[in-house]
Regions:
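Bacterial Sec-dependent N-terminal signal peptides
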Residues: 1-43
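Extracytoplasmic/secreted cell-surface and envelope-processing proteins
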Residues: 58-59, 115-118, 142-143, 201-204, ...
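Metal-dependent phosphoester-hydrolase catalytic domains
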Residues: 224-234, 242-379
Length: 379
């Protein structure tokens, strides 16, 4: 019996004072046991999308708006069945973009009024996702506006406002900018700008001053947020009717491709950049680098793909040590097969539009959606 007790004492002594291998094993076991009881961090995917829906009009005339071509008796024969199909199609796309979870935020361009947003969120298949929305009420002559759909469990709305674009050189009135801010689950404030800048009607060069004018107003509003928020988190999205290398984005917003991370997939072809090169007051274009590759874009014009739709973020949102961040590798153009059709004139594929000219196609839009994933880190 004494021999057994002595052996037990030796075993305990070996655990306490034994060799290094024993001590390491005990240490590992201790931390494994502790980790069972320690609360684990929870990471939530927070998907943000943007889409120009191409003329989402109802079938009724809005007073003082030039929406006559989208009435049942007009040349386009825009009737209730076509309108209802368009709503269902948009709901289908938004659901598909979200995959297994609904996108947290969706910026929409070319939506006519509150009626179409209410029908989309409450009278289409999208009603199952319980979206809420805010939108502008612009002086645009055609009556098209921008909107933001949001999931209330991920984004608590604090405020929203329309930012008007004063007339410039007697140009016709254009769409307001939409500024929305809300609280994330982390308690941080997120500022979102949804934009649809003046079109290229009349020529890209001739119409450029109007886009520069709108971009300058956007820049001023964004700068105000960047310099007043203690921890500015800004997302800018929408149809700029300009490409990443145009002046509105390159010179006015000064949005450029993010620095390359040392763990980036592009490290083989791009030099690594120190994370310290990120500036919280600077704007970064999540799709700028990809836009330089062939056949990449959200819009096809005369057989050439290009990026008219943009996702731009402040530097804080690229800091992976934070609790809400993204990276350019997460940003994509949504190329679901049913959104595309054969380009019979130039070859390849093109967006499957609702109308091609005046002919009804029954498709979705002349633009493809874009999106990115943020990581929301909860304690």
């Amino acid at each position: 019996m004494s021999l057994l007790k002595n052996k037990r004492r030796i075993s305990l002594r070996q655990l306490k004072y034994g060799n290094s291998e024993t001590r390491v094993a005990v240490t590992i076991l201790f931390f494994v046991i502790c980790s069972w009881n320690a609360p684990a961090q929870e990471n939530i995917r927070f998907r943000v999308a943007c889409w120009n829906t191409e003329n989402l009009f109802d079938t009724h005339h809005d007073s003082l708006k030039n929406d006559y071509e989208f009435l049942p008796n007009a040349m386009r024969h825009w009737n209730y069945n076509r309108y209802k199909k368009k709503l269902s199609d948009i709901a289908r796309v938004i659901t598909a973009i979200g995959e297994w979870n609904a996108p947290a935020l969706i910026g929409l361009c070319e939506v006519e009024n509150d009626t179409v947003l209410r029908d989309l969120t409450h009278r289409s298949p999208l009603q199952e996702l319980d979206y809420r929305y805010v939108m502008t009420d612009s002086p645009d002559l055609r009556g098209i506006d921008v909107a933001l759909l949001y999931q209330r469990d991920l984004f608590k709305l604090l405020s929203s406002r329309s930012i008007s674009i004063p007339m410039f050189r007697q140009h016709r009135p254009t769409r307001d900018l939409l500024h929305v801010n809300g609280l994330l689950l982390t308690g941080d404030t997120l500022d979102v700008f949804v934009c649809h800048l003046p079109s290229r009607s009349g020529g890209a060069k001739e119409s450029e001053p109007y886009r520069l004018h709108a971009a300058q107003i956007l820049r001023t509003e964004v700068d105000s947020v960047l310099h007043t928020r203690l921890h500015p988190q800004v997302i800018i999205m929408g149809d700029f009717n300009d490409y990443p290398n145009n002046k509105s984005i390159r010179k006015i917003l000064e949005a450029e491709a993010p620095p390359i991370r040392s763990d980036s997939l592009d490290i083989a072809t791009h030099p690594a950049t120190s994370p310290s090169s990120l500036s919280p007051l600077k704007l970064y274009h999540l799709l700028a680098r990809k836009a330089k590759t062939a056949n990449f874009g959200s819009y096809k014009y005369h057989g050439e793909w290009g990026l008219l739709d943009h996702l731009i973020v402040s530097g804080t949102l690229l800091n992976t040590s934070g609790n809400f961040f993204t990276h350019e590798e997460k940003a994509k153009v949504c190329q679901l097969p049913f959104l595309l059709t054969d380009d019979k004139k130039y070859g390849g594929k093109e967006p499957f539009r609702t109308y091609k000219g005046m002919k009804y196609q029954g498709g979705f839009s002349d633009h493809l959606p874009i999106y990115t994933d943020f990581e929301l880190v909860l304690p």
